[in-house]
């Protein structure tokens, strides 16, 4: 049976009749040959058949082997039979540095570098091997299955009466002393619990939340004609704000727009009815 050879060449090389004739002289007389242009294979205008050729000859006229042959090495690899070869014929001196790596990544084995000949490895066939024991006797298939089955049963089946170990009993007293404890804001005996300066336990956030909640409730209070309000209650709160802060001392200490003008001084904590004050303010306005 005659061998089949694929010749891959560049258009520039194919235009040189003498160079192309030298490539054809490398092929046996009885072999069938096929000529394809490399650029047409690169652009996929031509698809190479799978496992068809016994060998491939790549004829190029430049040293940029990776850019010219690199894109088609995988297709050429698939087009030859296992054990087939690819020979590079070039008018350039030698291949560029990356061609060897490109060829290896495409699956080729490097047989020679002068001239460059690549080969496709033969197919590896799986061969069944009979198992044998130490005495040279073949191992019984049933014995192997029984052995695997017994291991599986031992793994699944467990002793329900087996006593469980308490993990805490494995620790001694020294291990309990070294347990990392979360820092807390502990007050001195007889004092209220407050957040410390570098609070990390969350107490400071809780205090700020409660304080803002109380302030919001106090701001929501609206004075009406009959509203009874403890004036000092707001002043006692942590975030209380007053224009003068001296309304309870008397008119001499009150602002010009204070609602308590005309009223006598009162003690902090006294309940003040604003309705009476409003009547006095109206009477004072009439006199003015």
UniProtKB/Swiss-Prot annotation:
Q: Where is this motif: Cx2C motif 1?
A: 244-247
Q: Which cofactor does it need?
A: [2Fe-2S] cluster; [4Fe-4S] cluster
- List, in alphabetical order, the Gene Ontology terms for molecular function in this entry: 2 iron, 2 sulfur cluster binding; 4 iron, 4 sulfur cluster binding; electron transfer activity; metal ion binding
Q: At which positions is [2Fe-2S] cluster bound?
A: 185, 196, 199, 201
The annotated region (Linker) lies at 128-177
Q: Which UniProt keywords apply?
A: 2Fe-2S, 4Fe-4S, Cytoplasm, Iron, Iron-sulfur, Metal-binding, Mitochondrion
Q: Name one GO biological process term.
A: [4Fe-4S] cluster assembly
| Chain residue ranges for the region called Fe-S binding site B | 244-258
Binding of [4Fe-4S] cluster: at which residues?
244, 247, 255, 258
UniProt region (Fe-S binding site A), positions on chain: 185-201
Where is this chain's protein located in or outside the cell?
Cytoplasm; Mitochondrion intermembrane space
Q: Where are the stretches annotated N-terminal SAM-like domain?
A: 1-127
Listed InterPro entries: Anamorsin (IPR007785), CIAPIN1 (IPR046408), Dre2_N (IPR031838)
For this record, the Gene Ontology CC terms, alphabetical, are:
cytoplasm; cytosol; mitochondrial intermembrane space; nucleus
Q: Where is motif Cx2C motif 2 found?
A: 255-258
The family line of this record is: Belongs to the anamorsin family.
Q: Reproduce the free-text note on domains from the UniProt record.
A: The C-terminal domain binds 2 Fe-S clusters but is otherwise mostly in an intrinsically disordered conformation.
Subunit structure, as described in the record: Monomer. Interacts with tah18. Interacts with tim40.
Function, as annotated, reads: Component of the cytosolic iron-sulfur (Fe-S) protein assembly (CIA) machinery required for the maturation of extramitochondrial Fe-S proteins. Part of an electron transfer chain functioning in an early step of cytosolic Fe-S biogenesis, facilitating the de novo assembly of a [4Fe-4S] cluster on the scaffold complex cfd1-nbp35. Electrons are transferred to dre2 from NADPH via the FAD- and FMN-containing protein tah18.
Provide the protein name: Fe-S cluster assembly protein dre2
The organism's taxonomic lineage, starting at the top:
Eukaryota, Fungi, Dikarya, Ascomycota, Taphrinomycotina
Q: Which gene encodes it?
A: dre2
